[in-house]
């Protein structure tokens, strides 16, 4: 797997790239090879009153070559995704401590542009959903299946820090 992160000269713009090559073979049945690429471009703004806005565009692609003893097949999957995230940090500091309460709202839309409804399904297709994945754009860890449609994620983050390096999140 190969990953890169690139910040542009304009502040707040970030490009992320990730590539991987996977090959699966079996004694019985068919095997396949997969080449995938994941591109993400995001831009962050902050308004004068402290509202943090982040827009994100992402395209995940996967090209499959099925290696069967009798046939050979090709499949291309493309998963475009767009997201808008709003955060509004509320800060309170007093003497030796500081607290931040941050409401977060995220709206995400994704779709599957491939023509087939029977993808090769070798990766985990179970959605990982807990407090650490709530604001992840893709909650299914594998590439074979992705969430589709419009969804809204909302929550709160709380940070507490004491002068003596005591932190609570």
What are these regions (language model features)?
Residues 1-169:
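Outer-membrane beta-barrel translocator/pore domains, especially the C-terminal barrels
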């Amino acid at each position: 797997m190969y990953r890169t992160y690139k910040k542009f000269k304009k502040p707040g713009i970030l490009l992320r790239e990730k590539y991987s090559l996977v090959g699966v073979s079996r004694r019985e049945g068919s095997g396949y090879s997969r080449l995938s690429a994941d591109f993400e471009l995001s831009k962050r703004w902050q308004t004068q009153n402290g509202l943090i806005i982040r827009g994100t565009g992402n395209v995940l692609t996967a090209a499959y070559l099925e290696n069967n003893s009798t046939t050979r097949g090709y499949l291309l999957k493309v998963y475009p995704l767009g997201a808008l995230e709003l955060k509004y940090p509320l800060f309170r500091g007093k003497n030796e401590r500081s607290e931040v309460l941050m409401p977060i709202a995220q709206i995400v839309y994704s779709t599957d542009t491939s023509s087939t409804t029977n993808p090769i399904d070798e990766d985990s297709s179970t959605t990982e959903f807990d407090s650490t994945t709530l604001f992840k754009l893709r909650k299914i860890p594998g590439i074979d299946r992705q969430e589709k449609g419009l969804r809204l994620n909302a929550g709160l983050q709380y940070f507490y820090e004491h002068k003596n390096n005591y932190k609570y999140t």
